Amino acid sequence: NLAETLPRPIVYGDEDGEALLVSWGSSWGPVQEAVDQGRSRGQKISGLPIRYLSPLPPGLKEIFARFKRIFVVELNDSGLYGYGGQLATVLRAVLCDDRIQGITKTDGLNFKVREILGQADYLLGRSPVHARGAGIR
């Protein structure tokens, strides 16, 4: 089985916590910075880069189980079913985990750290308003 030969993804930050920011591609840099800034403010937030999509890397279910909330940060539309972008929808379907939510944006520009943290704060109930320029599903 090819999936079993892939390396397990490595969590950036604490191995468990309140929120896990999952990312792939060009969103990973801003996610790393968001994790660093969030942790410097005392938040239990970590990041996880996804490097393989088909098949998905092994161990995702076990990693996700250690976090209260999973946010998939991607430059993508929120999708037909409103779960977030395409990766969030795939992860929800494959892992059968309704804690997975998307933090999406479709204006063609990279995420700003404040957008990621603003949306994460909103989804975690810390802020009554989410960051402008990015969608939440």
Language model feature labels by segment:
Residues N1, E33-G47, V94-D98:
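Short helix-loop-beta junction
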Residues I50-P58, L109:
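Short acidic loop-to-helix transition motifs that present clustered carboxylates
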Residues L75-R137:
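Peripheral docking tails and interdomain loops at the edges
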Residues E33-D36, P55-A65:
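Short glycine/threonine-rich loop-to-helix capping motif typified by GTGT followed
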Residues N1-A19, Q32:
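Glycine-/acidic-rich phosphate or pyrophosphate-binding loops and their flanking alpha/beta elements
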Residues L20-V31, G38:
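C-terminal substrate/ligand-recognition segments
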Residues V11-E15, E62-A65, A93:
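Solvent-exposed alpha-helices and their adjacent loops that cap or buttress functional pockets
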